[in-house]
Amino acid sequence: MTQTGQKISDFELVAHDGEAVKLSEKLQEGPVVLAFFPAAFTGVCTAEMCEFRDTLKQFEELNATVLGVSVDIRFSLAEFAKQQDLNFPLLSDFNKEVISALGVRDDNFIGMKGVAKRSVFVIKPDFTVAYQWVAENPGQRPDLDEVRKALSSL
């Protein structure tokens, strides 16, 4: 699993709106918060993404870009974003390349293999992981105050 202090590789995924999102391009604007979640339309995932939605301004004030990431297809993510009025990109890692590279692939999620473990990474513009949190179980949600604290220290 990718740890704090390690560098990650660039990647490009398709967002819920069909646009290609490249990590390196987002990092040119400042740090990036990668918020991995197991599946759209599930209770804990919905609550987590809505908490990011409701506090997005606080992340923007820290010059950070928030990107939600799951293995759902972009069409499902588009409907999820619409229904929840999400105001940040949701990226489809349908081929499981990014979750595998970062070591947050869950092969035992209520009988499903290959979903994202609920996790959050703060990535600095030089691709270094400044903060990392991975849920011990999928019912846990990240402490967004801790994420913002990590961003404040950059």
Question: PLM features: residue spans?
Answer:
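Chalcogenol-based redox active-site neighborhoods
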Residues: 1-154
